[in-house]
Amino acid sequence: RRRHTRFRNVTGVQTCALPISGSILVSMASTKRAEIANFTGGEAAAITQQGNPYVFRTSFTQSTAMPKIANYIKDTVKAKVVDVVYVNNDFGKGGRDLIIKSLEARGIKIGADISSDPGQVDFSSVVIKAKQSNGDALFAYTNEEESARLLRELKKQGYSKPVIGETVLTSQKVIELAGDAANGAIAHVGLTADAPQPLVKKFDEAFQKEFKTRSDHNGLKGYIGMYTVKAVTEKVGKFDSKAFAAAMKNVSLSAKTTPGLLLDVSYDANGDLDRESYLTKVVNGKQVVSEILPPVNKK
């Protein structure tokens, strides 16, 4: 708490960044008082539902992502009953509520509704519950290390139904940790180094050359987020945190004029972003893009 109250006395700072839902939900009141724009990679829907004018996302809100996944489960997987595994934190509970709402709105029933703990190591009981439910597919919404452990346990117990998730499930880190147990996992992702767009490919090549590894979605979010700060600051014409936050409202930015954005992006009045996204599947240890999905508010 003492760390966050220090924002009140900071001067000359225009933006800050906090990565996950739990930390942004704690810090956002302090940065609001200090009138500092706060960028977050957190996906919890509650982040931008509180009317904080200084909060902006670098990833989709769960409210945007979950209907896209539910459409895929209904139209492509054609599942009638879906089991849900989620992590019991701000991130997981928000995702769980919205995927259930989105599935039920499409006539899909929920089978087992299974909570897991942050940092959980043993997923044997979770998988047993999913197998006993006998649903048509499993929706997994946990953090990266837990996702890898879940995938390994699913393979160990011979689970053969489709395993579907959002962003984390097919991320590079999960693939590395889960090994061949990640094969077949499907996810909607907002960003991936495997995207076919030329600017993303160029970023991927440069990142690998510099760091001898591939960037995951978090690296892309941070990179694009900072170029968003650059583009909007240039629009404002000066370093001014209040003017910057105001200029972020309903802004549309082009990757043609700011290549570091990699993709065209727009923000609404709440700080939620909109851009293209992807359906991915892990094939032979690699994330493969199967479909490019247009922005929700495509003009």
What are these regions (language model features)?
Residues 6-299:
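Extracytosolic ligand-binding ectodomains
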